[in-house]
């Protein structure tokens, strides 16, 4: 099993080191600040980064569905907003799709232009599911009657559901984008159209639900057992939290796996836990396995509250900074430019 750590989600954008001369030329203070930030980031490895307890779980936050909103002609209200219950589904999953119509906010209105006529309901809402080859998968009828997945009758949120069929599933280990075109029409034939979508994902490996933890070289390692159907490259990511539910660290690992059962490690760098001042037991609050052989990646589900560790003491973990050479070198070069 080949293993290579990859950059964490939270810090990925920070690892594109800006041109040294550009930063230094802006202001000496900015260059000095950037150098200080690089030295702070260098305390931790790229595969394990601290997470502020005040922030949302980064894995769960990354899976939040995006709301797409489209007004009528010339910006006429009401605007149609559409979204899904998740950003990815697999064969057999029930996908829920939502739509609502609301007047535009003051910030979205051009006060210098004549106000277009606002259309009135009631509205009939339908959705067309189309795959990335343009093939229609289904036509859906949305409802606002409190039935079949609609949470509350008459609340203005229309709901449709669809069970992902095996007949249209992607090959195992791959995924494809599915678009949904949502149309709302009233009795006057006023129409609102908005586009949403999701990922139809068929991962090549699955988390089994088995985990084990150990202390290794001053860091906490949680191993996850996975069952692999097809050989390929896989990304495992997880968030470690305190017993009180505060996020502490995000860890990622990239591995090439052959078919069969394997244990894959997530290493949470010990200095993060030492500096947090929090002892165990810790919780693997979220974890997900992604098949990364082709684009788009085949996302697996995010499993929450996956594992509780032994009651490690925070003083058992290393107090030594990781000292990332690339970031320390960048900081040194910035500091040299500031002194010129």
Model-derived features with residue positions:
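Gram-negative bacterial Sec-dependent N-terminal signal peptides
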Residues: 1-23
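Conserved, compact domain cores that house catalytic/ligand-binding motifs in diverse enzymes
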Residues: 213-265
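Short glycine/proline/serine/threonine-rich loop/turn segments at secondary-structure transition edges
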Residues: 151-153, 166-179, 272-284
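Short beta-strand elements
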Residues: 186-215, 293-340
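Contiguous beta-strand segments within globular domains
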Residues: 74-124, 157-159, 214-223, 233
């Amino acid at each position: 099993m080949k293993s290579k750590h990859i950059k964490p989600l939270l810090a990925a954008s920070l690892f594109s080191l800006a041109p040294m001369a550009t930063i230094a030329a802006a202001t000496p203070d900015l260059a000095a600040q950037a150098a200080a930030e690089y030295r702070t980031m260098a305390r931790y490895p790229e595969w394990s980064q601290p997470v502020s307890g005040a922030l949302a779980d980064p894995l769960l936050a990354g899976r939040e569905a995006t709301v797409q909103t489209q007004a009528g002609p010339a910006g006429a209200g009401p605007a149609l907003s559409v979204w899904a219950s998740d950003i990815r589904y697999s064969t057999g999953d029930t996908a829920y799709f939502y739509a609502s119509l609301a007047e535009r906010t003051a910030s979205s209105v051009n006060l210098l232009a004549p106000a277009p006529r606002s259309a009135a309901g009631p509205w009939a809402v339908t959705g067309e599911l189309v795959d990335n080859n343009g093939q229609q998968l289904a036509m859906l009828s949305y409802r606002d009657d409190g039935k079949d997945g609609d949470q509350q009758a008459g609340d203005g949120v229309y709901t449709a559901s669809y069970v992902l069929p095996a007949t249209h599933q992607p090959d195992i280990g791959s995924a494809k984008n599915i678009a949904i075109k949502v149309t709302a029409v009233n009795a006057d034939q006023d129409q609102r159209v908005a586009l949403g979508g999701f990922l139809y994902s068929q991962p090549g490996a699955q988390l089994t639900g088995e985990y084990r933890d150990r202390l290794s070289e001053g860091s906490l390692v949680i191993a996850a057992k996975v069952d692999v159907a097809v050989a390929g490259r896989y990304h495992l990511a997880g968030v470690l939290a305190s017993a009180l539910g505060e996020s502490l660290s995000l860890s990622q690992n990239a591995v090439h796996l052959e078919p069969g059962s394997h244990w894959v490690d997530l290493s949470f760098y010990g200095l993060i836990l030492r500096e947090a001042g929090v002892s165990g037991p810790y919780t693997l609050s979220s974890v997900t396995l992604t098949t990364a052989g082709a684009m788009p990646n085949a996302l697996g589900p995010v499993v929450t509250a996956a594992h509780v560790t032994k009651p490690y003491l925070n003083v058992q973990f290393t107090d030594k900074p990781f000292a990332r050479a690339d970031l320390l070198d960048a900081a040194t070069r910035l500091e040299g430019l500031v002194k010129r």
